[in-house]
Design a protein with these regions (language model features):
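A structural boundary/capping signal
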Residues: 1-158
Length: 158
């Protein structure tokens, strides 16, 4: 990632968690799980009892969050309105509990040049908490074109 100067949200979230650890925070990430879309991994931190996040995204609104959220559900919901696929469907459905990357210290996650897919695999295996009821999911409307265009300013196609 550092050599290529390009990162996915997973790599960006892990990198941000490492940076947060270096300045004294626990290296925490959490997974925002989507349907008909890719998940989003963000580094999270707590200041004076409130959660914030550091994230890498090609979408404008899926990045940094100030530490003003009282709980993880509230933080996850801050991504809901602007979490959509290219068909304009709101896709965010679940979030995980925080994962402290210190659990992977014996695998040298911060310094290895080898792939660290074990972190992504762990995120896929842990429970996630639903954000919406089935009735809510059924009644979601698509984003309007202006919102989609605004959120995709600077979007980098793969």
């Amino acid at each position: 990632m550092l050599q290529d100067r390009v990162a996915s949200c997973l790599e960006g979230g892990i990198f941000a968690a490492a940076a947060l650890r270096i300045i004294g925070f626990p290296a925490l990430i959490f997974d925002l799980e989507a349907e008909q879309d890719t998940d989003h991994v963000v580094a999270i931190f707590k200041v004076r009892g409130h959660w914030g996040a550091v994230a890498k995204s090609n979408f404008t609104g899926c990045r940094y969050r100030e530490p003003v959220y009282r709980g993880l559900r509230e933080l996850a919901m801050s991504y809901f309105n602007i979490y959509f696929n290219l068909r304009g469907e709101r896709t965010l459905r679940r979030y995980s509990r925080p994962v402290n990357l210190a659990r992977f210290d014996d695998l040298n996650w911060m310094n290895t040049e080898k792939p660290i897919w074990f972190i992504a695999e762990h995120l896929c295996e842990i429970p996630h908490i639903s954000l919406l009821t089935p009735a809510m999911e059924k009644n979601l409307i698509r984003l309007d074109s202006r919102t989609m265009q605004g959120e995709m300013v600077g979007h980098r196609k793969k």
